[in-house]
Amino acid sequence: MSQEYTEDKDVTLTKLSSGRRLLEALLILIALFAVWLMAALLSFNPSDPSWSQTAWHEPIHNLGGAPGAWLADTLFFIFGVMAYTIPVIIVGGCWFAWRHQSTDDYIDYFAVSLRLIGVLALILTSCGLAAINADDIWYFASGGVIGSLLSTTLQPLLHSSGGTIMLLCIWAAGLTLFTGWSWVSIAEKLGGWLLNILTFASNRTRRDDTWVDDEEYDDEYDEETDGVQRESRRARILRGALARRKRLAEKFSNPRGRQTDAALFSGKRMDDDEDIQYSARGVAADPDDVLFSGNRATQSEYDEYDPLLNGHSVTEPVAAAAAATAVTQTWAASADPIMQTPPMPGAEPVVAQPTVEWQPVPGPQTGEPVIAPAPEGYQPHPQYAQPQEAQSAPWQQPVPVASAPQYAATPATAAEYDSLAPQETQPQWQAPDAEQHWQPEPIAAEPSHMPPPVIEQPVATEPEPGIEETRPARPPLYYFEEVEEKRAREREQLAAWYQPIPEPVKENVPVKPTVSVAPSIPPVEAVAAAASLDTGIKSGALAAGAAAAAPAFSLATGGAPRPQVKEGIGPQLPRPNRVRVPTRRELASYGIKLPSQRIAEEKAREAERNQYETGAQLTDEEIDAMHQDELARQFAQSQQHRYGETYQHDTQQAEDDDTAAEAELARQFAASQQQRYSGEQPAGAQPFSLDDLDFSPMKVLVDEGPHEPLFTPGVMPESTPVQQPVAPQPQYQQPVAPQPQYQQPQQPVASQPQYQQPQQPVAPQPQYQQPQQPVAPQPQYQQPQQPVAPQPQYQQPQQPVAPQPQYQQPQQPVAPQPQYQQPQQPTAPQDSLIHPLLMRNGDSRPLQRPTTPLPSLDLLTPPPSEVEPVDTFALEQMARLVEARLADFRIKADVVNYSPGPVITRFELNLAPGVKAARISNLSRDLARSLSTVAVRVVEVIPGKPYVGLELPNKKRQTVYLREVLDNAKFRENPSPLTVVLGKDIAGDPVVADLAKMPHLLVAGTTGSGKSVGVNAMILSMLYKAQPEDVRFIMIDPKMLELSVYEGIPHLLTEVVTDMKDAANALRWSVNEMERRYKLMSALGVRNLAGYNEKIAEAARMGRPIPDPYWKPGDSMDVQHPVLEKLPYIVVLVDEFADLMMTVGKKVEELIARLAQKARAAGIHLVLATQRPSVDVITGLIKANIPTRIAFTVSSKIDSRTILDQGGAESLLGMGDMLYSGPNSTMPVRVHGAFVRDQEVHAVVQDWKARGRPQYVDGITSDSESEGGGGGFDGGEELDALFDQAVNFVTQKRKASISGVQRQFRIGYNRAARIIEQMEAQGIVSAQGHNGNREVLAPPPFE
C-alpha cells in the first residue's frame, strides 16, 4: 500500500516591497476602472449626452453617469462592437502583470516590439472584420471609424469575401506575434479539448483502455507468485521520456551530448558494443524505441522492394544500372523499356550480346552512374549480369521488342552460341571504306515493323565458387550514398515509363533468328537478293522497310568511347559512330528507287485509278472531245511514219481485258501498301518534296527499265534502251488550263504505263503532251518520267475540245526549242457574257413556285427570343435627376410617370402652377447637355393628359424587327390591301397605317436617317398584304439603287423607272388613268374605287358583266364589246423627289398636284420621298394636298417646319427614328421605324417572282406625241386661244419674248409664258439661250 504524503501549509502575512505595493494598488484601480467601463458600455443609451449627441434636459440612463456615457460613445465611435472587449483586455493585462513578477534580469525590446505590432494588427483587423461582417450597433458603424476606413479601402480591391480572408490571415499573424503561440500548438490544444468533450459526452475517459496490454495480465500472475509489485509500462515510458528530455536539455553543456550526435550520424548501429547508450537511471532501453533498439525495431519487417531495406550494398545498384545502360546501348535505343527477364526453362532465347562490355568504376558517387569501357579480358560478374530477379516491378516486366528493323539487335545463330567467349569483342559492323558502301538489306521473311523479340540472358560462364549472394540482417541507416542509388533507380523507372508499350508476343516457343542484318550481306548480294524477288509489290513494300533502316548502325568496339546518351522524354537513342551514308547516286547505281520516287509513282497510279472510277458517265461534250483527240492522235501517228521517227521502243502493252484487270489489281495493292507504310518514316528519312524530283544525277544514272522489276508491279514488262543524258527543264512543265468541265478521263482500253516508260533518247528537248490517251499512247506526245504526284494539275490531264496545232505539227529532231502544250481555248465570248450575277436581280434563275397565297413570315429575320428587362431602378434614378436638373433652371416639376420604349423613354412632368411649357421647350438643348444625352425632345401637349412629356434616349437601343410588327393582330385584321407598318411607338406598340386613308404620303429626311429603309418596310407590308390584282406599283428610282431590287415582281405596272423623262411620262399616264377611272365611276354611279370594284363583282355574280360605256369600234381590235374589269389600286413611289423636280422641271409639280388633289377616289396614291426638304422642292401646293407626312432626322428646325409645320425633327436620334403626322391629326407621333435588311427584301422579291411574272402595261413611259415631256405640254392638251395670233406676232416681229407677248395681248405673265412654251414645243421658236433670248425659227408670214 502506498502512503499519501501531506504537508502542513501555514499562511503567514509578509510585507511587500514599496514597488510591489504601488504595483498592486495600480492593478486594483485599473481592474475597478475596467468593471466601471464595462457597466458603462453595457448601459449605453443613445439619448444620453455624449461626444456625438447633445442633450440637456433628459435624465442620464447610463450607469457610469455622464463620464460613462461620454466615454462609451467615444469608444463605440472609434472601435464599434469591439469596444466591448476593451474591459476584458484591461483585466487580462492586469492579471498578466500580477502573475509575472519582475524576475528577468533584462528586457527583450525586440519581443516587446513584436508584441506591439501584434496588438496593432489584432485591433485593426478585428475592427475591419466587424465592419465587413457584423451589423451596425445603434447609430455607430459595427467596426467603428477604424473598421469603416479599412472596409471602404478593401471593398473596391478585394470585395467583401477577399477582404475578410485577408484580414483573417493578418489577425492570425498578429495573434502569433502578440502571444508567441504557434498555431500548431493551438490546433493541438483545440483538438485535445474537443476530444475531452466528446469522451465526456460518451461517459468514458480517454485513459480507460489506453495502457491495457498483455503485460498487465502477466503482472497479475507475477504479483501472485512473486508478491513484488512491478512498475507499469506507462510509468516506465514516462520516466524514459523525462530522462531523454533531461539529456536534451543538458546537451549543450554536457560534452557527452556531442558524442551522442556523432553516434547518431556516424552510420554505426546503436546496439554495437562500442556504442554508448544512455538510459534513464539504469533503466534498460525499450525494445519499441527506434533510437535505442538497434536492428530489433525493423528486423521482422523486411521489405525486399525497399531500396533501403533490401539487404544490398550501396554500390551494387550503381553497378546494376551501369550494366543496364550497357545493354541499352547494345539494343541501339529500342522502343521498349529497359528490363531484366528471368530465364525461361525449356526454351533457348536469343541472346543480345553487347558490342561493348561495361563495368562499374568505383569512385566518388555522382548523380548519374559512371560507366567505362571494359578491358578485353573482362568477365562480368553474375550478379551484375543477372540482378535481383525478385524485384521485377510492373514497369520492368518483359515486353516484346516491336520497332523498326533499324532498331533490332543482331541475333546470333546456333553455331555462334557454342563459340561465344567472354573475351571476344569483335565488332559486328565496321565503318565502310572509300570503296565500300553500305547497302540496306531487303528483309524477306518478316515485315519491317515486327522484328523478333530479343531477350537478355547472362553470358554462359561458370560463376566463381567463392562469391555467394548474402543478405545482411539489417541495412545501414545513415549512409548518404543511398541517395545515389535512389536517383539511379528513379532514372531507370523514368526511362521505362516514357517508352511506348509494344505489342505482346507469344513466349511459349523459342525465338530463332530468321533474318540477318544489313552488314552481314555484301552490297552486291543485297542487290542480287532484291533482284531475285518475283513479286513486285512485296519487294517494293519490303524495300521501303529496308530503305527506312538506313540510319541504323551498331556500335564498334576496340577502344570506342562510351555512347553519348540523350536523356529526356522519349526513348533513349544512342548516337552512332560516324559513318558515310550512301548517296543517291550510289543507291541509283544499284537499281534502288528512292522513297520519294516510289511515293510519286504510287500517288500517280492512285490518281489514274480515281480517273477510272470517276469517268464512268460521259457527256456529249466529253465524247466529242474524245473523238477530236482520237483524230489528233491518228494525225500525229501519220506524221511520225512520214518523218521516220523511230525512238519509240518495243514496249509490250497488255491488250486484253484480263491483263488490264490484273494491272488494276496490282496498282490498287501497291497503293494500299503505300498507304499502309507511308506513316512509318525512319528517323533519318527526309520528307518528300518536289525538289527531290529534280535531282539530275539520279535521272542520268537510274535504270528506269531493268530486265526484272525491282519495286514495281511485274505485270508490265519494260525494255531497256540506251539512255541519253537529258537536262530536265521543269519550267516547261506547264499544266493544262484548269477547266474541269472539259476534262476527259482516261479510258481503260489498254493499260498506260506512261509513268514507267524510259526517257526520250533522240530529241534533245522533251516533247510535252497530255499523258492519257484513249488508246495506245504515242511516243512523240509521251510525257517524260517525272513523278508529279503532289500536284493534282499534273495528275488530271484534260482532253481538248478541238485539235490543237501542236498535234498537227511533226516533230523536228534538230529543233532546239521544245514544243509547249497550248492551254485550252476558253468558251465562246457570247457564252461568257451570260452570268447569273449579271442578270438583273437574277431573272433567269429557275425558282420553285410557293404554295401559299402570300409570302411567309419565315423569310424575315425573327426577333431575339430574350428581351432585356426594364431597369426600373435606373429609370427612377433618371427621374430624380430630371427633377434636379429642372430645379437648376428654376423650374419646379415632378415626374409622375415614365413610359420606356425600345429607343426612348418618355417622362411625364407635372409642372408647378404658373410654369409654362414653352420654358421647357426653350431649354431642350440645355437639358440635353446637363443630362449628358444626345438630344432631348419636349412634348408640350400629351393627348388626354395634363402633363408635359420629356423624351430621353435609352442607354441600350433595341432593334425593331419588321417580322414582329407584321406578326400582330392590328396588321392581320386590317382588311385594306394598302395597309403599311411603320414601326413601334415609344410604348412599344406597333404603328399601322392605311395608305388608302392618308391618301398620299410625304417622307423626308437626311441621308442615313432611315428614309429608304422606311420606304422598303412600307412596300414589304403591302407585298405581305395584297395580291397583284389588288395593288399595282409604279416605282420611280432616280438613284437606280433603292427600288431597283423590286424589278420583276408581278405587282409592277411597268419596269422600274430610272430615266426622269420616262418618270414624267409615267406621271402623265397616271393623270390620264385617273381621268379614265373617274369617267367609269361616274357612269356606274359610285364614289370611290371600292364601290366600283363592288359593282363589278356584283355583276360578275349575276352573270351579266358590265360593258365599257366609252368604247368605240376604232379604239381597239376587239371584235366584241369589252366589259369592265376589276381595277387595282395604283401606288406611285418616288424615291428621290428632289432629283425629279430638278431634272424634269416645273411640269412635274403640276402633275403631282393634280394627282394629290383628285387621285384619292380613283385609287391612285403617291408616296414621295426626298432627302432635301427645302421649300423649292416641297412647295406649298404639294404640302396643301399631302397632309400625311413622315419626318426623319433633319439638320435644322427650318427643315422640320418645312415638313411638319413645326419643330422636333431636328432632335431625332436617326437610324429609323421618325415623327409620323397622321391624317386628321396635327400632333406628330414618335415612331421607331422597323429595320429591314437587304437579304429580307431579296427573299420576299424572289418569293413573289416565283409566283408569276409581271404583266406590264404598254405606253406608260412612252409618249409619241411629246418630245419626252421636257417642260412642254403634251399633244393631247388644247392650245391657247391666242396662240395663232401670238405666232403671227412673233413671226412678224422676229423676236420672241414673254414680256412682248404679255404687252401685246395684255395678258398675264403665266399665260404669256405658257404660249411661248407651246411655240417652243411646236418648233416655232428655239429654246432659251445662255442670255435668255429665243430665236424665231419659223419664216415670216406671207403678205
From Swiss-Prot:
Gene3D superfamilies: 3.30.980.40, P-loop containing nucleotide triphosphate hydrolases (3.40.50.300), Winged helix-like DNA-binding domain superfamily/Winged helix DNA-binding domain (1.10.10.10)
The organism's place on the tree of life at top rank: Bacteria
Residue segments, region Disordered: 357-475, 556-586, 600-619, 633-863, 1256-1275
Membrane topology note: Multi-pass membrane protein
Coarse class of the protein's main subcellular location: membrane
Compartment(s) where it occurs, according to its Swiss-Prot or TrEMBL record: Cell inner membrane
Any single Pfam family the record assigns to this protein: FtsK_alpha
Extent of the signal sequence: none
PROSITE patterns given in the database record: FTSK (PS50901)
Bias (Low complexity) ranges: 402-415, 662-671, 721-830, 850-860
Assigned protein family: Belongs to the FtsK/SpoIIIE/SftA family.
Quaternary data: Homohexamer. Forms a ring that surrounds DNA.
Free-text comment about domains: Consists of an N-terminal domain, which is sufficient for the localization to the septal ring and is required for cell division, followed by a linker domain, and a C-terminal domain, which forms the translocation motor involved in chromosome segregation. The C-terminal domain can be further subdivided into alpha, beta and gamma subdomains. The alpha and beta subdomains multimerise to produce a hexameric ring, contain the nucleotide binding motif and form the DNA pump.
Name of this chain's protein: DNA translocase FtsK
